[in-house]
Amino acid sequence: MRAGHFGWRAARNAVRREVQVPRLDFAETRHLNSLVQRPPMAKSSGIIVTVGITGASGAGYAQSVLRLLDGDPRVQRVFLVASEAGMRLLATELGVVPTDAKKLPSLLTGTAAKKIEYLPNKDIGASIASGSAIVDGMVIVPCSAGALGSIAAGTAGDLLTRAADVCLKERRPLVLCLRETPLNRIHLENMLRVHDAGATVMPAMPAFYYAPKKIDDLIEQFAFRVLAQLGLPQEKQYRWKGGKE
């Protein structure tokens, strides 16, 4: 009985030596991911977008993005989800404290916001948690380092990170507006991981070459660029035409 047992182990080990699964390093993985084409998002009308808000500073960016999406005739529907820290951020930076969370879209946009639907972050069974739901893309603005890490690790512990994970697995546009500085090695590696998985890492870095007059100009121009990444270019976005030496 004992001899037969060792004979079986020897045979198993022999098979393992014959069948070896190659391990891919980061460079090889990036190359393979680059070969997988992501379906284009842009279409004439009826675009559905998910907007996520986390606790990183930059609530004004989220507000501007939502206002633009709400007013864009090409956008049919917007799903809004905010983490607990994201809700605290909105209260701290914008003074938005809804007594009813469903009123959050209208409080942020200053309109009826009929095309924006608020989804609780704890509702892991919401439509956007499934790849079968029709969603054309997602932006997390601002995106905290914590949310970035969760997405990079694929843990998806709440609706916000699950919706982002769905975009990656379905090869849909995912824009992460990271708001963190300085960056440590873990942040940089997580940025590389989500990039290689198909996301667009778009740190919240405003531009100054168009001579903005006020902070709102900086915020709005950045929001224009965010929407461009989602296939929704805006006519008012400043376009650099070259400078003089």
Each PLM stretch: what is its role?
Residues L35, M41-L174, P182-E245:
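A cross-family phosphate/adenosyl-ligand binding-site feature
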Residues R17, D25, G110-K114:
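Generic detector of bulky aromatic hydrophobic side chains
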Residues A3, E18-L24, T29-S34:
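N-terminal amphipathic/hydrophobic targeting modules at extreme N-termini
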Residues R16-E18, A27, I53, L232:
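Alpha-helical protein-protein interaction elements
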